[in-house]
Amino acid sequence: MQGPAVFIDAEIDDQAQELRKFFKSLGAEISEEKSSKGIEDDLHKIIGVCDVCFKDGTQHTLEEIDAVLNSVVSIIVSIPLERGENLILAFCEKMTRAPDSNLARVCLQSLWRLFSNLEPTSPLRYHVYYHLVQVAKRADQVKEVFSGVDQLKSQFSQCPPSNEQMQKLYRLLHDVLKDTNSELASKVMIELLGTYTAENASYAREDAMKCIVTALADPNTFLLDPLLSLKPVRFLEGELIHDLLSVFVSEKLPSYLQFYKNHKEFVNSQGLNHEQNIKKMRLLSFMQLAESNPEMTFQQLQDELQIGENEVEPFIIEVLKTKLVRARMDQKARKVHISSTMHRTFGRPQWQQLRDLLHAWKANLTLVQENMKSVSEAQIELAHKQ
């Protein structure tokens, strides 16, 4: 998201007085006269009433409101940062009061201008960005201010927020993303859990549970094994949520169905959809079967995945769409031929398998190199004889 540079062709004092008059005309309790205490007091009073332009009945367009807020921002950025912190925080809080999405978009632009005009080394950028995310949610523009964790970190590279501040921001991002982008919300929660250390991981119980639930609910997250290594998740061992995660990490469909039968109320209380869970477990079970079965019959899939005869082909097509498995379907022979599959877990056996594969490639390449060398030498020798 890009905001225009802040520049108003008027003296700061004159701007402040015009803003006072404008807000007073809208019914705000503010004097039209400039403060004898200086521009900072003027700005304090202006920010205190600037949300009056959000009220119903104002005869001003969104463009006019945007211009007024831009004028406020232009004064804010002219104040030295060491004296402007409270003013910036107060303005940010006012921008979160936009009553509808259209006004929220105007406020989002104003906050983005403010954020863009702060020095990259300013710690206030964090506070402005936090409010940016809040307003972006109301404006349905979250993707404009957050595209991923790497982008987020780069924005604060010259003045990294504290660990506690990042935890607060990650929680907010998860909250605004969970209903519209579950995959990104899951990544944010995993990043959040990564901020905890062995010393404070026990305090991350709620975050860890949210992370697990978000990952399980995300239809595009299938590699769940890394969650088990996160310290806050380890502290949940022995609890139902950890048991459920373990089922999704390494068990097959029957194990999930048994878990649901025994703990139906718990699963539902976490906001998880049973039918979606079954769909995901079928995909995960297929992946696990594909690891050790280069060829599977349709009947085998019916039995293992508990699906009807007419559901097998549509299911295989859905699996192939995920690109988790590369396979070829032989409809005539009613078989599936597996080329490759993503492993559900990647532990020591998988590393050993990868090591063996790389060694085999190395040996084959060495053999090819030696054969090519022999052919080359033979050709040279033949050329000399001729």
Swiss-Prot record:
> Where is this protein found?
Cytoplasm
Return one Gene Ontology term, BP aspect: formation of cytoplasmic translation initiation complex
The keyword 4Fe-4S is assigned to this record: no
Per the record, the major location class is cytoplasm
Cellular component GO terms held in the UniProt record: eukaryotic 43S preinitiation complex; eukaryotic 48S preinitiation complex; eukaryotic translation initiation factor 3 complex, eIF3m
- PCI domain: from which residue to which, for each copy? 181-343
Q: Which SMART domains match?
A: PINT (SM00088)
Question: By its UniProt entry, which PROSITE patterns does this protein fall under?
Answer: PCI (PS50250)
List each coiled-coil range: none
Kindly state which keywords UniProt assigns to this record, in alphabetical order: Cytoplasm, Initiation factor, Protein biosynthesis
GO molecular function annotations of the record: translation initiation factor activity
Q: Does the keyword Cytoplasm apply?
A: yes
Oligomer and partners: Component of the eukaryotic translation initiation factor 3 (eIF-3) complex.
Q: What function does the entry list?
A: Component of the eukaryotic translation initiation factor 3 (eIF-3) complex, which is involved in protein synthesis of a specialized repertoire of mRNAs and, together with other initiation factors, stimulates binding of mRNA and methionyl-tRNAi to the 40S ribosome. The eIF-3 complex specifically targets and initiates translation of a subset of mRNAs involved in cell proliferation.
The UniProt family comment states: Belongs to the eIF-3 subunit M family.
- Kindly provide the name given to this protein in its UniProt entry: Eukaryotic translation initiation factor 3 subunit M
Species of the source:
Aedes aegypti (Yellowfever mosquito)
